[in-house]
């Protein structure tokens, strides 16, 4: 990892090989639910809408203590050539501002609830709204959200709940990682995050520590099957583990496949402190992980797509979930000598948490439910051909060539030694004969 070398130059200006596939959920029984003839919303997956994630590494500094500090920035760019669906299509979706704010105020006093209900009635806010796909992703606002963000900015710090806008709005952080030959087993794992040894999301250091975490662009070197990798994605709000699954062959190289376990979002059974529920809150069912600290305290939890491996009682609160382990699980394929990921795929679903909102008449039918908002898949589809060629030379060609070259050098060295000994012996023999010849010459001569 030095300027001018291929690994550094590839990392500093990474090729755009990460695709973001966004899936949103459309409410298909909008009229029936609004008129009360049906009490459970039916969701239909719409997508994918495909974006390319642009990654930028800037302000790069090599530190004297064997670390590298840089600022990482990510943004999503729509790819028209890869899409068949229009961003102008209409959706029927939950009113995130109304449901989120009533859930946030679920424990408020009677007077707060009364005043809020008056505001909602005056603005004619409904629990379901019609909106374009583009606005749902990038520009989701309404009069209630604008009003609240101005009146109580400490409680409502944003006036735009576009889901991709919330993910990428503040996706710029300073990261310090270990590099150098003395850090093989912790190569490119975090030492500091925004100048601290913790993320700042959790009060418990076990959940909040940055140690061993990696952003997934590179993993540590000399990866073994016994290693547990630690992947950090900001919108997951914590580090998630990856475990060895099997050996594979990728691009002609021997690789290891690590997977994200299906119980990743399950709470620990031993009673230890978990990283899935905020202190003081009622624990979420298995398969749901709190992410509100990463989204301005907006009540949201993460899960695997379509509630895969989530408590069935949660899945049955809505219609339309179709979990598929093959489609919705995650993995990464790594070349173990260098720790370079050759391919990776991971899915995550964001769900709105609606607490007991019986005190708010427009939304009381949503009380104590988890409503899927969207799910996205991050797919690193490969690495550039020049990097493939370099990797193949380093991990396949070079070891074999090294053995042959070493053998040739041994033969050459032995031959040169033999020639040297032979020449030395010839010179020594000539010297002896010359001495004998001079010693036997007649004195008269």
Indicate where each model-derived feature is located:
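Extracellular or lumenal secretory-pathway regions
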Residues: 1-254, 260-445
